Amino acid sequence: MLSTSSRSFKSKFRAAFWPVHNYELGKFIPMSALMFCILFNQNILRILKDSILISEISAEIAGFAKVYCVTPAAALFVIIYAKMINRFTFEKIFYYLSAFFISFFVLFAFVIYPNIHVFHVHPDNLADWMERYPHFKWYISLVGNWGYIVYYSLAELWPNIFYVLLFWQFANELTTTEEAKRFYTFFSLFGNSSLILVGFLMMNLSSEDTIIKKFMSISDSKITLVQVSTTIVAIVAIVCCVLVRFISKNVFTNPLFYAKAKSGRSTSERMGLIKSFKYIAKSKYLWLLLICSAAFGFAINLVEAVWKAKIKELYPTVNTYAEFNSLYILWTGVAIMVMTIIGNNVMRMHNWFVAAVISPVIIMVTGILFFVLIVFDQQILSLFDGAILMSPLALAVSIGGIQNILAKGTKYSIWDTSREMLYIPLDDELKTKGKAAVDVISAKVGKSSSGLVQSIIFTLVPTATFTSISPILMVVFTFVCLAWIYAVRKIYFEYQKIA
């Protein structure tokens, strides 16, 4: 009796804290390592792109870059990817895309950025044109600072291409629905631990007492930061390619790990590009997925835009901005790991809807609190006169940081793993090209729609700032979050029909 009870306890303990069987480690470990490396690079690039663009230009320019540069680039990528998937294996696509992105990042770090005065319009001429045409000043700034804009755009595309699309497409092909319920939360747990490592690493590299000084003299700290960070990104990208090669040759060919190993991975003829998108357009399921992903991008970008403008006021240089950003990334990693464990148990004990709706609810509540602080800052400070021991600016940055940590923590743990389960029961066409369209385009549509709202306001009112337009952004933010919750509810009903 005791033995049976003991085995039952061990079984329940294993199911809760380590549901991966020993014979599955040959599949689980390399996939977790691949996710770790992709997210490692993603977060270094996230720190660099914001630190460079916002410190070198302004926070307002980010919205224009997302609308007029990032979104067109994302749309172009989806078209190219749909062509590539008909001609190349996943392995080759991963190599080609890695080579393209890393080549530009290296070119920027070692050629363009150190000689930015050669490649960009002279600041005095740019300022003169912007003053002469105030309604078009941000568009002039986009063109005049093209190097920063291209770097920002490619760094923005990295997470949607390499993590959301390529990694999860790889994982969805390799993993069954039953395995996904056990694996995906732990992929997220191990993969997102990279944020903590990146946080500590980039805090050191961007600080005045950086370890780099022990190995080389530093003439310009911001250029050294970008060059050292880019070198690390390039090395980790090579490791990613090695892992993809290993998984393709050793996991996909093993019947123990992959059910289709004996017959080979699907080689059935794919639809043409036009026919493929017509097929996707008819899917209500994918349209709901698109709304959910776009809503996150839209909502979080509204909050982040205001928050990042406040960060620049407090930390005006590239290195100080990067150091603060690194601290934020570190705590985001901690939040993701904690919420991943919570999400795993929520998903096991409740239905998919309960787990999936956590993200939009938390983002809406914390986002509204942040906007209330920005809009009614003087009233709040006078109400708590003497009780708040920091400046209004420092308080806004701190509260915004907490909001973003909680929002990203729930999104990258609970929501991402919940969303990926929605693709598993789909057919191959929707699982590949449909996923590409939803994952790459939707997030950028969300962010660019948010950026479009901001860009229209800044174009019509050149003197506007993020602080002055915060009341408008708060109303839009609330509406978008409610639409996201509604879409999650609707897609849950669709998922139940096919799962």
Curated annotation (Swiss-Prot):
Name of one Pfam family that matches: TLC
Membrane topology designation: Multi-pass membrane protein
Keywords: ATP-binding, Cell membrane, Membrane, Nucleotide-binding, Transmembrane, Transmembrane helix, Transport
GO cellular component term of the entry, any: plasma membrane
Transmembrane region(s): 25-45, 61-81, 93-113, 148-168, 183-203, 223-243, 286-306, 327-347, 356-376, 380-400, 468-488
Gene Ontology molecular functions: ATP binding; ATP:ADP antiporter activity
InterPro entries hit by this protein: ADP_ATP_car_bac_type
Similarity remark: Belongs to the ADP/ATP translocase tlc family.
Function: Provides the rickettsial cell with host ATP in exchange for rickettsial ADP. This is an obligate exchange system. This energy acquiring activity is an important component of rickettsial parasitism.
Record-given protein name: ADP,ATP carrier protein 5
